[in-house]
Every structure is written in C-alpha cells, then in structure tokens.
Swiss-Prot record:
The modification Hydroxyproline is found at residue 64. PROSITE patterns: RIBOSOMAL_S12. This is Small ribosomal subunit protein uS12. GO terms for biological process: translation. One of its GO terms (cellular component) is ribosome. Belongs to the universal ribosomal protein uS12 family. Component of the small ribosomal subunit (SSU). Mature N.crassa ribosomes consist of a small (40S) and a large (60S) subunit. The 40S small subunit contains 1 molecule of ribosomal RNA (18S rRNA) and at least 32 different proteins. The large 60S subunit contains 3 rRNA molecules (26S, 5.8S and 5S rRNA) and at least 42 different proteins. Keywords: Cytoplasm, Hydroxylation, Ribonucleoprotein, Ribosomal protein.
Amino acid sequence: MSGGKPRGLNAARKLRNNRREQRWSDLHYKKRALGTAFKSSPFGGSSHAKGIVLEKVGVEAKQPNSAIRKCVRVQLIKNGKKVTAFVPNDGCLNFVDENDEVLLAGFGRKGKAKGDIPGVRFKVVKVSGVGLLALWKEKKEKPRS
C-alpha cells in the first residue's frame, strides 16, 4: 500500500519537484508567474486608466433582474483597447458625453463582472477631471470646454 507523499531522509528532491509541478494547477500562481495580468488585461496591471467615451450603451441585466444598466464604451488612451464601463448612480449618465475623457477603475471581483451586469468589468470614476460623485452630489460642476 504505497500512498501519500515520500517521507524518507533523502526525499527532499522528490518533494520539491512535486510541489513545483503542482503549483501550476493554482490559477493565482499561474497568472502571477506567466505575467498574464500585464499582457491580457486592458489596464495592463494598473488600477486605473484614462479613456475617451465612444458611445453610451444600455446593458441588459441578467436574470432574474430586469433593468437596463447604463454603461459607456470607452477607448483607452494607453493602448487603444475598447472596454465597456458602468456609470454608477441614478442620472449620472447625463454627466457623461461622447468624446469626454473619463477615468476608469476596476469594478467587481478580481477582473470578473459584478452582479447582474454581464461582461462589464470597469466603472467610471471621473469625467473631464471631476469626480462623478461630486457631480452627482452637485458639489462641483463639469468644466465647459
């Protein structure tokens, strides 16, 4: 009955090699070791990114909810990739116009979508250099250009 791991005095190499091979099954290790966060994610490993608004879109919520979530299509300045970003709060889509410069941040769980919004991994934080929350609370006004 041979089961389990080797336990002898001279088993260190076997244990080390085994552990090294098994680590590749761990998704977090694999992503870190291969550097895929920098290669594949639109933000390139950073927490925020600036972009230009291309259009406003409504994304339908997943079942069992029924709503149209207000989002914008944004082209990132740093690499030209196009992403969809959620615009939080009631009526905040009115502050965002096409060709505005927006600051995006992550939204949801470790690069996955949040809640009932399919495929939307980012949210709008600032519009034309002014915080979206400040605009919404009417503490600041959007600069007229």
